[in-house]
Amino acid sequence: MHEMSLCEGIRGIVEDQARRHGFATVKVLRLEIGRFAGVEKAALGFAFDVVMRGSAAEGARLEILDLPGRALCYDCGEEAAIEDRFDPCPLCGGGRLMPVGGDEMRIKDMEVQ
């Protein structure tokens, strides 16, 4: 389950930010996760609760914000939202697409005290 290692990375970031900015507790942590990031959200939620024990984020509410998949169409030159990596261009029907968004995962923000 790679979600556990993702949460370990999040914990490291939280601990670093707590030292830098002097907060003791994270109340809410918001993650942006792209459609194509390959993250199982239920597993991430479980791993988050386990990995954050003993950290500033112990007991924090995890909010996940879904980011759409995006691709550049080489046929029409436009960028568009797509549901699946192998979808045709929703604008022109072309099949030559290069994904340009939706594979990211990042901390958007945290509510701290």
From Swiss-Prot:
Zn(2+) binds at C73, C76, C89, C92. One of its GO terms (biological process) is protein maturation. Ni(2+) binds at H2. It comes from the Bacteria. PROSITE patterns: HYPA (PS01249). Keywords: Metal-binding, Nickel, Zinc. NCBIfam families: hypA. HAMAP family: HypA_HybF (MF_00213). Belongs to the HypA/HybF family. Involved in the maturation of [NiFe] hydrogenases. Required for nickel insertion into the metal center of the hydrogenase. This is Hydrogenase maturation factor HypA. It comes from Cereibacter sphaeroides (strain ATCC 17029 / ATH 2.4.9). The lineage of its organism: Bacteria, Pseudomonadati, Pseudomonadota, Alphaproteobacteria, Rhodobacterales.
